[in-house]
A protein has these predicted regions:
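Extracellular adhesion/carbohydrate-binding repeat motifs centered on closely spaced tryptophans
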Residues: 1-183
């Protein structure tokens, strides 16, 4: 088992890996996953669809986990890009003791404390207000209903000022129920 030119990997029989996953252990004892395409070259610095699921690989070819690409996308502990509604710890609240983020809370049965609802489109991109100049909050229409999101993409409830302006007028506010839907 050995790397060739830092882009290819051969097994103990000298056979190059093609269309296969490779699981290695780093110096800290953590697992790292790599994927090798049909040419045998390691996939790096891109999204790759494998068995109808999307994965992202960093510049070194490692499959990425958690919040990635400026916190606009999220991949689970299995590395699969998430879409739709996801209840997650916001990216700023992650433990950043290492250079990579591992979402240890996912599926752990931990309480909901500190988790917020985020919505990811079919392309995997997190919904945030359309206009960053509109203030702290903005609305997005999902399945015919309006929801409010803050600049980090966390769904909001209660009264929110969703319009920009120098004056704080009541017309600028909308109410969002516990389910996040505009009322």
């Amino acid at each position: 088992n050995d790397w060739v030119d830092s882009e290819y990997y051969v097994d103990s029989n000298g056979i190059m890996l093609t269309d296969k996953w490779l699981k290695l252990t780093d110096n800290d004892g953590e697992y790292e996953w790599y994927y090798f395409g049909s040419s045998g070259k390691m996939i790096d610095d891109t999204w790759k669809k494998i068995d109808d699921k999307w994965y992202h690989f960093d510049g070194s070819g490692r499959m990425e986990l958690g919040w990635i690409l400026d916190d606009m996308y999220y991949t689970g502990t299995d590395g699969v890009m998430r879409t739709g509604w996801q209840k997650l710890i916001p990216p700023d609240d992650y433990d950043e003791q290492s250079d990579k983020v591992v979402p240890s809370y996912e599926g752990s049965g931990a309480s909901d404390d500190g988790k917020y609802w985020f919505y990811f489109g079919t392309n995997g991109k997190k919904y945030v207000p359309n206009d960053s100049s509109s203030g702290d909050y903005g609305t997005r229409k999902i399945d015919g209903e309006y929801y409010c999101f803050d600049q980090d993409g966390a769904m909001q409830t209660g009264w929110r000022d969703v319009r920009s302006g120098s004056e704080d007028d009541i017309e600028d506010y909308m109410y969002f129920g516990a389910d996040g839907k505009a009322k």
